[in-house]
Amino acid sequence: MHLFKIISFIFFSSIIFAQNYSLESVDDCAACHDEIVQQWQTSMHALSTLDQDVLYRGMYEWAKEDTKGKITKKCKNCHTPYFYLSDTMLVNKEDRKRPVDCLYCHSIDSLHLEPKFSPMKYAANDNSLSDYHTIQGRDHFENEKLCMQCHAELINPNQVAICTTGDEFYNQSENKSKCQSCHMPNVKGYKSSESDSVSNVHTHAFLGPHNEEFLKGSVKISGKVNGNTLTITIDNSKTPHSFPTGTPLRMVLLKVIGLDRNGKIVYQNWQKNPVNEDKQALFARMFMDEKGNMPSPPWRAVKVGNESRLKPGEVRKITYKLSDAVSKISAKLFFQLAPVPILNKLKIDDPYLRKAHLIDEIEMELN
């Protein structure tokens, strides 16, 4: 990924720069930006390390054992971006364990062919009024380019694209919303302790699927019945990337239940496993290994075996045949951060990871 180039460039390019650069802590930032740091502390950026992210740790240890450690450096590029900094120049062993934090993102000067870091602080706009440090404005804080350093793509050793958010975004032309519009929306607050008044500030909670409220309504569903045919419409028109996106562990499930006049369940589109019972109700990206096994761990993949996610901007219609006994329909769309069998294998009991999170739901009376 591009991030490795970023890190390599900065920390191996200038000994003079390294000698003058110090790694401030998040606590230093909190002295003036307490409100923003509190938001960040709830984010997955703050929890990106092996110590804090139980799913990342489980997948990392599995990949490490399965590949004899050959691919784990790719994981650390983004989860602990200080990892690749030179021992002799900048970062001690403890700092190498730091998550994606204030200093890392706000020290990025430019994102051209060779991204450049600097001890200067950067943000969306210039600010020379601070007593503590000067801030220079950079465009990449107001577009997708900074985010895409980690969220664009991940290629496995077999040259199979594992994460494809960047391609999804750049290959669609209908919606060019910037990442920050949804994942860092404006909230009322103080930019720093020096601020005289409340203003609109981009939240640094970095909203995503680990925030249940953020998930709700991110994709909408609706239904229509014509005779004995039920059509469920799933609307991803507001999203400029596939849904779900990011790690291929994520999946979206559609559950349809039909009730008779007495409230008894007389129809279900699937009961135990949509992969076997109703493939059109599963929205996911699955990989196949060289032996034809699917799903395959991402690092073993030789090709994509199934791609059923909602495309950027897609509105998909799914039909079901109902019996005359069905009097009422309930349809729910759920988001799961990882398949339960994977969580079982990794011995992860985290309730949020195991929960099917409701995105949207409808109920329809048929007669």
Model-identified regions with their sequence ranges:
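Alpha-helical interaction segments
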Residues: I7, D28-C32, S195-D196
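N-terminal intrinsically disordered, low-complexity tails enriched in polar/charged
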Residues: I16-Q19, N367
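A generic alpha-helix preference that emphasizes hydrophobic side chains
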Residues: I15, V37, C102, E144-C147, ...
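Sec-dependent N-terminal signal peptides
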Residues: H2-I16
